[in-house]
Amino acid sequence: MELRDLSDHVEYRAGRGIEEVARELGRDPSEFVKLSSNENPHGPSPKATIAIREAATGVHRYPKAVHADLTGALADRWDVGDDQVWVANGGDGALDYLARATLDPGDSVLVPSPGFTYYGMSARFHHGNVAEYDVAEGADGFEMTADAVVDAYDGERVVYLTTPHNPTGARFTLDEIVAVADRTDEDTLVLVDEAYGEFTETPSAVTLFDGQPAGGHAPRDDIAVLRTFSKAYGLAGIRLGYAVVPDSWADAYARVQTPFAASVIACQAGVAALDDDDHVEATTDSVAWGRDYIHDELAARTYESHGNFVLANVGDAGRVAEAAKREGVLVRDCTSFGLPEHVRITIGTRSETERAVAVLNEVCDT
């Protein structure tokens, strides 16, 4: 038999791991620091680590009860109803659920360029078409504006807004998000990806739902918000994310989710991580320091960032990333994002960040 036509589909390529690079170069993994995948260098929440150990003996059971526990904890955190929280196997799983709930074959979505490849991948998996809007660099850096989105809008069923945006670090304000929703059709979903939301002081778009303190904005039923445990909570390896949706979608989750959408271990870890504010605060404080340090000390143009990373214009991203790799520092060459002059530097520990800046200054100067 033949597969369906996959010619329009692209491969998602994650940043390479330390072990893979070490094998390639014939060196010891301990020689490298990985600042290429926006992971939490401080590791998982200590409370989550304990919960993972305790959950291990229960993995022969399906996660129905603990799934409900996590859903309730998230609903309490955001002051929404349990039915408004769609727990998933990573943020990408939540994207798939939202695509299933909104897209008919032939519908189109509007995604940022550059941006997260999986937005378009998920739409195409669900027989949708993909259009793009530009995240352009202006005199003051990269900006996220409603005008840029709406100028490219042509009635798409879903519009994806990433805030803070990867890889630029720029953000949408709530006013700009509302402007996009106001200026698109009432049947268009504005999907706000807040995977890096813990690292910005901008209020979450969850505050735009009915019953929330939206700062003077009318409540919306055409916005959904994506969140993840991969970044600030340090749980990227267990794959846990969720969407927060309008209360009018109450019965849709059961119709679009996979059976037991997240594992016992993931759900237990998520519940524990939500109760570990000290870990999140230490992480975000470290990121704030690291962003300032890179902006101040890196001898290349950097851009204001509201994520756990900084984008830098180094002239030839491929050459610089390769040279840094040979010096033991892995950063993200952003050529694949359409930014061949830029690298993205994840904020590491203090020593990792200082080492990365020193190496990049050296290789950029050669």
UniProtKB/Swiss-Prot annotation:
Annotated GO MF terms? histidinol-phosphate transaminase activity; pyridoxal phosphate binding
Instruction: Recite the UniProt keywords alphabetically.
Output: Amino-acid biosynthesis, Aminotransferase, Histidine biosynthesis, Pyridoxal phosphate, Transferase
Under which main EC class is this enzyme filed?
transferase
Task: Give the catalysed reaction(s), semicolon-separated.
Answer: L-histidinol phosphate + 2-oxoglutarate = 3-(imidazol-4-yl)-2-oxopropyl phosphate + L-glutamate
Q: Which cofactor does it need?
A: pyridoxal 5'-phosphate
Name the Pfam families on file.
Aminotran_1_2
> Residue positions of the PTM N6-(pyridoxal phosphate)lysine?
K231
Gene Ontology terms describing biological process: L-histidine biosynthetic process
TM region(s), chain numbering:
none
In which pathway does this enzyme or protein participate? Amino-acid biosynthesis; L-histidine biosynthesis; L-histidine from 5-phospho-alpha-D-ribose 1-diphosphate: step 7/9
> What's the superkingdom here?
Archaea
Coiled-coil residue windows: none
As recorded in UniProt, its EC number(s) are 2.6.1.9
Q: Which PANTHER family match?
A: HISTIDINOL-PHOSPHATE AMINOTRANSFERASE (PTHR42885:SF2), HISTIDINOL-PHOSPHATE AMINOTRANSFERASE-RELATED (PTHR42885)
Q: Which family does it belong to?
A: Belongs to the class-II pyridoxal-phosphate-dependent aminotransferase family. Histidinol-phosphate aminotransferase subfamily.
What is this protein's record name?
A: Histidinol-phosphate aminotransferase
